[in-house]
Amino acid sequence: MSKQILILPGDGIGPEIMTEAVKVLELANEKYQLGFELTHDVIGGAAIDKHGVPLADETLERARAADAVLLGAVGGPKWDTIERDIRPERGLLKIRSQLGLFGNLRPAILYPQLADASSLKPEIVAGLDIMIVRELTGGIYFGAPRGTRVLDNGERQAYDTLPYSESEIRRIAKVGFDMAMVRGKKLCSVDKANVLASSQLWREIVEQVARDYPEVELSHMYVDNAAMQLVRAPKQFDVIVTDNLFGDILSDQASMLTGSIGMLPSASLDTANKGMYEPCHGSAPDIAGKGIANPLATILSVSMMLRYSFNLTDAADAIEKAVSLVLDQGIRTGDIWSEGKVKVGTQEMGDAVVAALRNL
């Protein structure tokens, strides 16, 4: 029986980078006889233009029925002035929450070929390999009440709520510990327990879960210190587990240690490892349509999909090796280009990865 993959290119550079990722996926499908069947739909701004909402009900049902979802990126200035509740990003939040995709895996890996692209000294970032495990469906992005009210003095006041339940914390903590077990058996839980009640509960529950993982060395760090340590000495980290807001910020920060957010994939998983896979970067409307976007994060998201949702390790490894071989050849999109390397566009980079994968 074929496995169903739903392709959601999205907005901005999304369709361009997705075209290249799909080429790689289709070759892997053929080369390794994976039995994937691909279907396409719209999300975000493209869905607003077509359906009037950022995520149509029929698209959500397709996503539920699929074995995995591959997403490009959503959003753009065209939709920035519409009502907040129907902006493109709301489609992304809705699909995550409706599919129960509570666990976000965001690796920050520095490819040795790109050491000179990092803003930090090579000796600080060489060999960097961090996995950030971010809680994705709770916290301040989903908390209620939220809104804007008018105070007695006529001034407007905006407010949000940052709630976390024990079960929400426990399940993401388990993902963090499980990830640590297959990596370096080291886990850093990041919170703000000196100020926030939600973080105090977070730390308490993480300590409880730690009792089931005696082999894992657990540490705690306040988020402000973690942000500083990621720049000062990033290689002290192996796996980081944190909440939705902190994970959003820290994973973007960690991405720049690697030279370009255009290199970094992500996975969002439910309790059964069914997932949605997408690049860490946004829709980059400023370069959309120019054919210069880096498709490697989306291509590497395909690799994560094969690894985490389907346990197809050989095919996942082959895609990652193909990307590494292309970098060995000095082929670069503009965001990771340096003197003496070959600058190419989106399609050429995708073609290079396809050629490398075909020859493996």
Curated annotation (Swiss-Prot):
Reactions accelerated catalytically: (2R,3S)-3-isopropylmalate + NAD(+) = 4-methyl-2-oxopentanoate + CO2 + NADH
Marked site: Important for catalysis: 141, 192
The species this protein was found in: Pseudomonas syringae pv. syringae (strain B728a)
SMART domains for the chain: Iso_dh
GO CC annotation terms, alphabetical: cytosol
Record protein name field: 3-isopropylmalate dehydrogenase
PANTHER family, per database record: 3-ISOPROPYLMALATE DEHYDROGENASE
Family per record: Belongs to the isocitrate and isopropylmalate dehydrogenases family. LeuB type 1 subfamily.
Pathway membership, UniProt: Amino-acid biosynthesis; L-leucine biosynthesis; L-leucine from 3-methyl-2-oxobutanoate: step 3/4
Subunit record text: Homodimer.
EC number, as in UniProt: 1.1.1.85
